[in-house]
Structures are given as C-alpha cells and as structure tokens.
Amino acid sequence: MAASAGPEIERLIGLLAKLPGLGPRSARRAALALLKRRDQLLAPLSDALAEAAARVKTCSTCGSLDTQDPCAICSDGTRDASLICVVEEVGALWAMERAGAFRGRYHVLGGLLSALDGVGPDALRVGPLVARASEPGVREVILALPATVDGQTTAHYLAERLAGAEVTVSMLARGVPVGGELDWLDDGTIAQAMRARRPA
C-alpha cells in the first residue's frame, strides 16, 4: 500500500487536479515542484492567488475578468462600440486581443449550449447580449465561437435570438489556416474553406 503524502499535501494535490489540463499525476508533480521550490514558487504563487481573489472581478458589461468594473476594454473610448464580438470564455477574448485584429467590444457567454452537459440558455449570458445588441449604435455582432457541435448550436441559437435586434450577425470565417497544406487538413475544414471562399 502506498504511503499517504499527508492531508495538507493531498489537499494541495486535490485542488491542483481540479484545474483544466491537470490530472492526478500532473497535479502531484506540480505540488512537488511547488513544495520543493517554496521561496521561488509557492510563496509568490500564494500571494498572487490571494491578490487575484481579492482584486479581480467580472465585468458587469461584457463578462471579462479585470481589476476594474467596467473592464479596461469596455472603458476604452477608442474602441469601436458598434461591434460586439461574442466569445465562449475569457481565454478566447485574450486570444483575440493577442491577435490584434479586433478593436470593438466583447461579450463573454460563459460557456456553450450543450444538451449532453445539460447547459441551456439560462446558464449563459444570452439575455445581456440581446440587450447590448439592441442598444443604439450597435450595428454588428460577430459570433467567434468554436467550430464544434456545441459551438455551432450556440451560434445558431444566438442568431435566432438576435434576429429581432437591428444588427448584422456574422461568424468568423472557417477554413485553411495560414501555412496549412491541404493534404494535412481534415475533410470538414477543406469543405468549409471552399464554402467560405472569397474573391482574390
């Protein structure tokens, strides 16, 4: 029988294992690394977690995370308030910002519709999106959702819900990635790229 690491360490491992991408073995390795490097990793991480817990809030406008409410993006007067980009989670918003291709505002849904997981419209920030899309000056809502079954189901549902607002509803183009070679792509990606083709 394997020896226990002790309740404090097991609790740390258990909490780390709840993070996305970390299973029990990875969590155990992470816990050991933190404990071996207490001064360099564990203490600063503990301070950063405490500060984040105390200061980071959810933006009441878009649903992003920031230390201010409304967040820095919603408060930025230089951004195009006529464009709202809808994303699944905050990580997707951060990816869009890293790409630097969008200068409008965002709306974080907080997930996707999923019959399998029992996630319905009431579990997402759909009502606030419809309200924002109906505000004067908003002219386009861009659905930047994953190209998955749940992502497409959610996009279709949102397009129907936004039909009453006087806005254009668009989706991100899908298809061949930059640097992608056709013989390495799956059939669905190639078919979508063909349907989404545009003039050269």
Curated annotation (Swiss-Prot):
Question: What is the disulfide pattern of this chain?
Answer: none
Where is the Toprim domain positioned along the sequence?
82-177
Identify the Pfam families for this entry: RecR_C, RecR_HhH, RecR_ZnF, Toprim_4
Q: Which one of the record's GO molecular function terms can you name? A: DNA binding
Give the keywords, sorted: DNA damage, DNA recombination, DNA repair, Metal-binding, Zinc, Zinc-finger
Q: Which residues form the signal peptide?
A: none
For this chain's UniProt record, which GO biological process terms are given?
DNA recombination; DNA repair
InterPro entries on file: DNA_Rcmb_RecR (IPR000093), Rcmb_RecR (IPR023627), Rcmb_RecR_Znf (IPR015967), TOPRIM_dom (IPR006171), TOPRIM_RecR (IPR034137)
Annotated C4-type zinc fingers sit at: 59-74
Which family would the database say this protein is a member of?
Belongs to the RecR family.
- What HAMAP family does the database record attribute to this sequence? RecR
Summarizing the function annotation, the protein's role is: May play a role in DNA repair. It seems to be involved in an RecBC-independent recombinational process of DNA repair. It may act with RecF and RecO.
- Put simply, this protein is called Recombination protein RecR
Organism listed in the record: Phenylobacterium zucineum (strain HLK1)
> Gene encoding this polypeptide?
recR
